[in-house]
A protein has these predicted regions:
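A ligand-binding cleft/hinge motif common to bilobed small-molecule-binding domains
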Residues: 108-111, 124-133, 177-180, 204-240
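Short, solvent-exposed loop/turn elements at domain surfaces
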Residues: 70-75, 130, 176, 254
Length: 280
């Protein structure tokens, strides 16, 4: 067959026009598909605003405490447990923080706060009498500061401490009460031994270095419960402590306020009571 040049050009132009139209349709479909993908991605981003959902790490709250059963201590696996530990974990979950527990020497607690090694002190810490020294959250618990003696001791009440040797934890309320004697019930003792931790305090009574020891009732109850034939707690309490969470003064005001509200809610709904009973 003989093709005329004019016919060939016409057919070629028609084929080119069809191909061009087909490409334009495919391009529009491609652009539309991309648009749908971006819209879906945007919707997913809007929906996943929780840092945990999108895989973001929560900010850390560094909590300083010493080893003080049943409030804060290590279990057999080396994991922090106790009333204050569970409470801190529950509160931090609501606040959007990851709690990190830093064990410290308690009588150096202010240094840790001042140099920023910890954000707060959360370890059966007494608020009353220290209201202006820290930025507080709480109180969340009330605790009796009590006195433990050997069962063969003649000490039966606070007045019997006159001329006796008493072991306390350094920088705590019992130390202050015994040294300053602002309470008229407290007599002049022979010696106040200010020790760094409860293990040393318990050992001092076991070995007969002191006549009496003091501490939070829940802690001394555990000590006495392990040897009830050897030790006893006096009925008369030395002090009633309001326990709180301490931040460096004039810092973390908003966080402390929110924390106080959550702690109050946990008191009201019985959550805190259940935690305390768990560690009995």
């Amino acid at each position: 067959k003989i093709f005329h040049t004019q016919d060939l050009c016409l057919r070629t132009n028609l084929r080119c026009a069809k191909d061009s139209a087909r490409m334009e349709i495919n391009l529009k479909k491609y652009i539309a598909a991309i648009g749908i993908c971006f819209m879906a991605l945007g919707a997913a981003c809007i929906m996943k605003t929780d840092p945990e959902e999108v895989g973001e790490e929560l900010p850390e709250l560094i909590i300083g405490s010493d080893n003080y059963e049943p409030y804060n201590y290590l279990d057999d696996d080396g994991k922090p447990v106790g009333i204050d530990v569970e409470l801190a974990e529950a509160v931090c979950e609501q606040l959007g923080y990851t709690p990190v527990f830093q064990y410290i020497v308690w009588d150096k607690k202010d240094e840790y706060l001042d140099n920023g090694k910890v954000d707060c002190l959360w370890g059966s810490f007494t608020m009353n009498g220290r209201e202006d020294e820290y930025q507080w959250a709480g109180p969340y618990l009330y605790s009796r500061q009590v006195i433990a003696v050997r069962t063969d001791s003649k000490i039966r009440n606070i007045s019997d401490l006159a001329g006796k040797r008493v072991a306390v934890q350094a920088t705590t309320k019992p130390e202050e009460v015994l040294l300053e004697r602002s309470d008229p019930r407290v007599p002049e003792v022979d010696m106040v031994y200010s020790l760094s931790g409860m293990d040393e305090i318990y050992a001092s009574l076991r070995k007969g270095y002191v006549d009496a020891i003091t501490g939070h009732e829940s802690a001394l109850e555990r000590f006495v419960g392990n040897a009830p034939d050897m030790y006893a707690i006096l009925d008369e309490s030395l002090y009633i402590s309001e326990l709180g969470v301490a931040f460096k003064n004039d810092t973390h005001q908003d966080l402390a306020k929110k924390m106080t509200q959550i702690l109050k809610e946990m008191q009201d709904d019985g959550t805190l009571r259940d935690m305390v009973e768990k560690y009995g």
